[in-house]
Amino acid sequence: MKLNFLVTTVALLVAFPPPYECRAIDSSSNQPATDPDGERQSAPVLARLGEEYFIRLGNRYQNSLRSSPDTYPETSQYPKRALQLQLTQRLLEGKVGNVGRWDGNYALRALDSEERERRSEEPPISLDLTFHLLREVLEMARAEQLAQQAHSNRKMMEIFGK
């Protein structure tokens, strides 16, 4: 088991080597005295919404993503990435609704609010129902497993004594 883990770890490190700038975030001793761009690299943003996603702001992987530094200006990437983070969070929370409303069309906003009201009155769609049923089945299986474990523990206590 340990050997499999070691081999897998080595294979992943060989396949995906860590970036050149792999160092502690807030360590003042590891940072160079002068930054070539005059900017500090920003810290990773951890958004936990169901699963953990790391969205990195800044130019940590600049060498691996672009061949030349003049392809995209760095200042225009921050607002785009911030907007992407915000939209991703809203999509994962289910608060966006109709994505087309972001174009500034106010008629779509009115239609979207009417659609939300109508949707709240309707029964849940099949996908929601499927996940609800799956959640209930998993809870029942967990309860059954706990009951079996308790029964097994009682038998062991009877056999070995208290």
Swiss-Prot record:
Its main location: secreted. The modification Phenylalanine amide is found at F160. InterPro entries: Corticotropin-releasing_fac_CS, CRF, Urocortin_CRF. It is found in: Secreted. One of its GO terms (cellular component) is extracellular region. SMART domains: CRF. PROSITE patterns: CRF. Keywords: Amidation, Cleavage on pair of basic residues, Hormone, Secreted, Signal. Residues 1-24 form the signal peptide. Residues 25-119 form a propeptide. The keyword Signal applies. GO terms for molecular function: hormone activity. PANTHER family: CORTICOLIBERIN, CORTICOLIBERIN/UROCORTIN. This hormone from hypothalamus regulates the release of corticotropin from pituitary gland. Belongs to the sauvagine/corticotropin-releasing factor/urotensin I family. This is Corticoliberin-1.
